[in-house]
Amino acid sequence: MKIDLITIFPEFFRGPLDHGIVSRAQKAGLVEITIRDLREFTHDRHRTVDDRPFGGGEGMVLKPEPIFECLEAMEIPPRGNRENVQVLVLSPQGRLFDQTMALELSKLDRLVLINGRYEGVDERVSEVLADGEISVGDFVLSGGELGSAIIVDAVTRLLPGALGNADSARQESFTAVAKEISEGPDSTCASGGLLDYPHYTRPAEFRGYVVPQVLQDGNHAEIQRWRRRRALEKTFKNRPDLLEGAELSKEDQKYLAQLRAGKD
């Protein structure tokens, strides 16, 4: 997979992309990440990438010309003629990024992320070049770079071979897409759209805090049952909105009814 990051602050990505899973995936040839400096596609001595908004108002807007020229230099086909390639603009007005979207993007051959700054990007970029706009949350950041780093990490870890253990992606929070991530039969650990269950490691006892006994006993059926219930509890407490779209068994629903009764 290829990922292109179009930005006026290329140095921003030196840290986030040079560590952990993203770094290992690049070294293994699973993903090729290229940072495109938008200022290289300007033609004045000040390397101007922004200008005042039409109609007045505060702030500056990223100009369309450098972005158009950047994509042309990358030989990105016109919108409508792209095969397994997407161009997305980071914007607070965009589609909310989630785990399902991360899986969708991980199946692309190429992903181009245009990082907005200031008051945003000239709308003609979205109207003509981009396949859509994407947002990482209902808040405003100084620019799209932080959001892009999040997207790159979330997408890269879903690429085949990026994680040491294929089960890791299936068991994580929000994995309603567990069946698609799984290469084999459905896993009993798959979260099915719930938040992740609690994790513990050695030592079993630390300063009086003890790992739950069920996790130490080695009964896999009981461990799975315990983990599922803890995931239900966490989701019920912290993100009840996720329960509407979660994959719930009759046992799950019965346990949730008990939680609701206890809460009331």
Curated annotation (Swiss-Prot):
Subcellular compartments: Cytoplasm
Q: Give any Gene Ontology cellular component.
A: cytosol
Q: Tell me the GO BP annotations in alphabetical order.
A: tRNA N1-guanine methylation
EC numbers listed for it are 2.1.1.228
Report the principal subcellular site.
cytoplasm
Q: Where are the transmembrane segments?
A: none
Q: Which InterPro entries match?
A: Alpha/beta_knot_MTases (IPR029028), tRNA_m1G_MeTrfase_C_sf (IPR023148), tRNA_m1G_MeTrfase_TrmD (IPR002649), tRNA_m1G_MTases_N (IPR029026), tRNA_MeTrfase_TRMD/TRM10 (IPR016009)
Q: Which UniProt keywords apply?
A: Cytoplasm, Methyltransferase, S-adenosyl-L-methionine, Transferase, tRNA processing
The GO molecular function terms of this record are:
tRNA (guanine(37)-N1)-methyltransferase activity
Reactions accelerated catalytically: guanosine(37) in tRNA + S-adenosyl-L-methionine = N(1)-methylguanosine(37) in tRNA + S-adenosyl-L-homocysteine + H(+)
Amino-acid positions noted as binding S-adenosyl-L-methionine in the UniProt annotation, renumbered to this chain: G116, V136, G137, D138, F139, V140, L141
| The keyword Endoplasmic reticulum is annotated on this UniProt entry | no
Q: Which Gene3D superfamilies match?
A: 3.40.1280.10, tRNA(m1g37)methyltransferase, domain 2
The protein's job, in short, is: Specifically methylates guanosine-37 in various tRNAs.
Quaternary state and partners of this protein? Homodimer.
Q: Provide the family line.
A: Belongs to the RNA methyltransferase TrmD family.
The name under which this protein is listed is: tRNA (guanine-N(1)-)-methyltransferase
Its source organism is Koribacter versatilis (strain Ellin345)
The top of its lineage is:
Bacteria, Pseudomonadati, Acidobacteriota, Terriglobia, Terriglobales
Q: Which gene encodes it?
A: trmD
